[in-house]
C-alpha cells in the first residue's frame, strides 16, 4: 500500500477520537462485522427466480485469509501484529485452518431474489492517546467470515447496489472499544500460546488418593477470554439461514500448555502421561468437522458467533494432601455456537477494559481422575494368576526402591493382602482398560498399560495395615510397595477369604496398638472417597476369658461419620464379623461400650466428608 493511501485512510477515518483514557499507547478491539471499502471484498451475487432457494457461501483458506495493516510512523506492522496477538487473538495460527460459511434464503412466490456475498473482518487498533484525544491510530483488519445482503426485486426492476460499494469501512454489527494499555517498558514479542511456564494455582482440597501422579479430565468447552478463540460472527437477516463450517485438521491445531515446573512437567512429559491415562490421540491426521446452522425469524435479524473450544487436562504430582507440581494441557476440541438478536449498528460504543487472561468453561463440568505410574518406578510381574493362598517373595534387587507388582487372580473373590508383619502399608490399584487384554495362555503378556484406578491403601509409613479387596479373574491389578529396607519385609501374602469379612471389601484395615493405658488415643488416617469406608482393628488389652472386659467409647472429631463395631472371629472358612453396635452419628460421641479383654474388634466408619479422619478411642477402666 502506498504512503498516499495510508495518509488518505488516516485523515479520513471517522473512528472515535475522544476517549476517557490516560496518556499512552493502547491496543483496542473494535469488534467483528466490518466491511472494507475495497472492491475485492465483494465475492459476487446469486439470482433466484420466484420461489427458488439461493445458497451463497465461501471457504476461507490461508491464501484468502489476508489481514490488512494500516501502519503509522510510530506503529509498524510487527508492532501491531504482536500487540494484537498478545492480547486478543493469534490470527496467524487461525489462518491455517479453513473456515466455511454460507447463507440460504428462498425467494417469494411473486419476486426474484438477489443475494450478494462479502467478506467481513474483525478490526483492531493501536492508538496513541494524549490529553483524552487519539492523536495517532494504526488499524489491522483480521479476516472473520462474511455477510450476504439480500434484495427482493420484480422482473426488470433496477437493483440499488450502493450498499455493496462503500467508500468507507463500516461495521454491520455493533462496534466495540475493548482496550488494554501497552506498557511503555515492554517490547511486544511474537505470541506463543502453546507452551508457557506460569505460576499455576496448586491449592486444592485434599483428594481421596495416595501420593502419586494423576491425570484429570476437567471437561470440554473451554475458551480463552477476550474472544481469543472467536472464529467469526455472521449477521443473519430475517428469513435467512446461515451456517458456519470448520473442517478441523488436528495436525494443524496446537494445544495450549502451562506448567508450574518445566523441568519435571515438560510438555513432552505431560503428553506422555496423558497418553498413559486416556490414550489420547494428541496429533493425528484425521479430519473432523463441525457445523452450526441457524435461521432468523421473519421479524428480526440475528447474529451467530462461532468459537474454537478445548478439552482441558491436568497432570498433578500429589504429595501428602497437596499438589506439589501441576501442568495444564488444553487439547483442541471442536467448537461452540452462540446465537443472539443482532445488535444495532447505531448502539453507543462503550469503552471497556480487557478481561484478565484465562479460560472459561462453557461445556459440562467433568472431574475424571486417573492415576498413572511414574515411569521412574519399577514394575514387577507375578506372571501366572495367583491361587487362593499365595506368598510372593519380593526380589532383593528392588528392595530399597518403590515398585509396583502386577498380578491377576485365578478365582474371583475377596482377598486379604498384606506385607509380612503388616508393614509396610500397601496400596492396590486396578489397571484401567486391562480386562482380558493382556493375558496370553493364562499368563500376563505385557505391562504396557500404565493407567491405574485407586482401590484402597495408605501412604502412612509407620501404620500397620492390611487390605481387604474384591478381585475379579482376568483383570489386572497393581500393588504398590513403598520404598522399604530389606530388614522390613520381603513377602506379600495373598489369601482368598470365605467368611463374611468380605463386608469390608475394598477398604484398608488399620491395625491399632498402644491401647494398654487408660485415657484418650488419637488416630488420624487419610480418608478414601465419600461413601466408602475406613476401618480400624484393635485388640483389647488383657487375657481373654470371655468374662473380663474394658470400657471404651468411639468418636470422631471435626468429621461426621456413620460407624459399625464388629467383633472379629476366625473359623475354618476364614475370618468372620459379628456386629456389636451400629452408630448413626460418631461426631463427639461419648456413649460407652464394654468390650471383652483379649478379643479383637474392627471399627468401620463410613466416610461422609472428604478429609483426614480423626478417630478417637477413650479407654476408661477394666470392668
Swiss-Prot record:
Supply one GO CC term from the record: extracellular region
Coiled-coil annotated residue ranges, if any: none
Answer whether the UniProt record assigns the keyword Secreted to this protein. yes
Changes after translation: Limited treatment of L toxin with pepsin or trypsin produces shorter HA-70 proteins (called HA-55, HA-23 and HA-22) sometimes observed in vivo in other strains of type C and D botulinum toxin preparations.
Going by the UniProt record, its keywords in alphabetical order are: Hemagglutinin, Secreted, Virulence
Q: Where in the cell is it found?
A: Secreted
* Keyword set includes Secreted: yes
Looking up Pfam families in the UniProt record yields: Clenterotox, HA70_C
**What is the additional note?**
This protein can also be encoded on a prophage.
What the protein does? The hemagglutinin (HA) component of the progenitor toxin protects the structural integrity of the neurotoxin; may increase internalization of the neurotoxin into the bloodstream of the host. Involved in binding to the small intestine through interactions with glycolipids and glycoproteins containing sialic acid moieties. Erythrocyte agglutination only occurs when the entire complex is assembled. This HA subunit probably connects toxin/NTNHA to HA-33 and HA-17, the other components of the HA complex, and it may also protect the M toxin from proteolysis upon secretion.
Q: What is the protein name for this chain?
A: Hemagglutinin component HA-70 type D
Source species, please?
Clostridium botulinum D phage
The encoding gene is: ha-70
Amino acid at each position: 500500500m502506498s504512503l498516499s493511501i495510508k495518509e488518505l485512510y488516516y485523515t479520513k477515518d471517522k473512528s472515535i477520537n475522544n476517549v476517557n483514557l490516560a496518556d499512552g499507547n493502547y491496543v483496542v478491539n473494535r469488534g467483528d462485522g466490518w466491511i472494507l471499502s475495497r472492491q475485492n471484498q465483494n465475492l459476487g451475487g446469486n439470482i433466484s427466480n420466484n420461489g427458488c432457494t439461493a445458497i451463497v457461501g465461501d471457504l476461507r483458506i490461508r491464501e484468502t485469509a489476508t489481514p490488512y495493516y494500516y501502519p503509522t510512523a510510530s506503529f509498524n506492522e510487527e508492532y501491531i501484529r504482536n500487540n494484537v496477538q498478545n492480547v486478543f487473538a493469534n490470527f496467524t495460527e487461525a489462518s491455517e485452518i479453513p473456515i466455511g460459511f454460507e447463507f440460504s434464503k428462498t425467494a417469494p412466490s411473486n419476486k426474484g431474489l438477489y443475494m450478494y456475498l462479502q467478506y467481513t473482518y474483525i478490526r483492531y487498533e493501536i492508538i496513541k492517546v494524549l490529553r483524552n484525544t487519539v492523536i495517532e491510530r494504526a488499524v489491522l483488519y483480521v479476516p472473520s467470515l462474511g455477510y450476504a445482503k439480500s434484495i427482493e426485486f420484480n422482473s426488470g426492476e433496477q437493483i440499488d447496489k450502493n450498499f455493496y460499494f462503500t467508500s468507507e469501512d463500516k461495521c454491520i454489527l455493533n462496534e466495540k472499544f475493548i482496550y488494554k494499555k501497552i506498557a511503555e517498558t515492554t517490547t511486544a514479542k511474537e505470541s506463543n500460546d502453546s507452551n508457557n511456564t506460569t505460576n499455576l494455582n496448586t491449592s486444592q482440597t485434599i483428594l481421596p488418593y495416595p501420593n502419586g501422579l494423576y491425570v484429570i479430565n476437567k471437561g470440554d468447552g473451554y475458551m480463552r477470554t477476550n474472544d481469543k478463540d472467536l472464529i467469526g460472527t455472521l449477521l443473519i437477516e430475517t428469513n435467512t439461514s446461515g451456517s458456519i463450517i470448520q473442517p478441523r485438521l488436528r495436525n494443524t491445531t496446537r494445544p495450549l500448555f502451562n506448567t508450574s515446573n518445566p523441568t519435571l512437567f515438560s510438555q513432552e512429559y505431560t503428553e506422555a502421561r496423558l497418553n498413559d491415562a486416556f490414550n489420547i490421540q494428541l496429533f493425528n491426521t484425521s479430519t473432523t468437522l463441525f457445523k452450526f446452522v441457524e435461521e432468523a425469524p421473519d421479524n428480526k435479524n440475528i447474529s451467530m458467533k462461532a468459537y474454537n473450544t478445548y478439552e482441558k487436562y491436568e497432570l498433578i504430582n500429589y504429595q501428602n494432601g497437596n499438589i506439589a507440581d501441576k501442568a495444564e494441557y488444553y487439547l483442541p476440541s471442536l467448537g461452540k455456537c452462540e446465537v443472539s438478536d443482532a445488535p444495532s449498528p447505531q448502539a453507543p460504543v462503550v469503552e471497556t477494559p480487557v478481561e484478565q487472561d484465562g479460560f472459561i468453561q462453557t461445556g459440562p463440568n467433568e472431574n475424571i481422575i486417573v492415576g498413572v505410574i511414574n515411569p521412574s518406578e519399577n514394575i514387577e510381574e507375578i506372571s501366572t494368576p495367583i491361587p487362593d493362598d499365595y506368598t510372593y517373595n519380593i526380589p532383593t534387587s528392588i528392595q530399597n526402591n518403590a515398585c509396583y507388582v502386577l498380578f491377576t487372580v485365578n478365582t474371583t473373590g475377596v482377598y486379604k493382602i498384606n506385607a509380612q508383619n503388616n508393614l509396610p502399608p500397601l496400596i492396590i490399584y486396578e489397571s484401567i482398560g486391562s480386562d482380558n487384554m493382556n493375558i496370553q495362555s493364562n499368563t500376563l503378556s505385557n505391562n504396557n498399560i500404565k493407567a491405574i484406578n485407586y482401590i484402597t491403601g495408605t501412604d502412612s509409613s509407620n501404620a500397620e495395615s492390611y487390605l481387604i479387596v474384591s478381585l475379579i479373574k482376568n483383570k489386572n491389578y497393581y500393588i504398590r510397595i513403598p520404598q522399604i529396607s530389606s530388614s522390613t519385609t520381603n513377602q506379600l501374602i495373598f489369601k482368598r477369604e470365605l467368611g463374611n469379612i468380605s463386608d469390608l471389601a475394598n477398604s484398608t484395615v488399620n491395625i491399632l496398638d498402644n491401647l494398654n493405658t487408660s485415657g484418650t488415643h488419637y488416630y488420624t488416617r487419610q480418608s478414601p472417597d465419600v461413601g466408602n469406608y475406613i476401618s480400624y482393628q484393635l485388640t483389647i488389652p488383657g487375657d481373654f476369658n470371655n468374662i473380663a472386659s474394658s470400657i471404651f467409647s468411639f468418636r470422631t472429631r471435626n468429621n461426621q461419620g456413620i460407624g459399625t463395631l464388629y467383633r472379629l472371629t476366625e473359623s475354618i472358612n476364614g475370618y468372620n464379623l459379628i456386629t456389636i453396635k451400629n452408630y448413626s452419628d460418631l461426631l463427639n460421641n461419648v456413649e460407652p461400650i464394654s468390650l471383652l479383654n483379649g478379643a479383637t474388634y474392627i471399627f468401620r466408619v463410613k466416610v461422609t466428608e472428604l478429609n483426614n479422619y480423626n478417630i478417637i478411642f477413650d479407654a476408661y477402666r477394666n470392668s
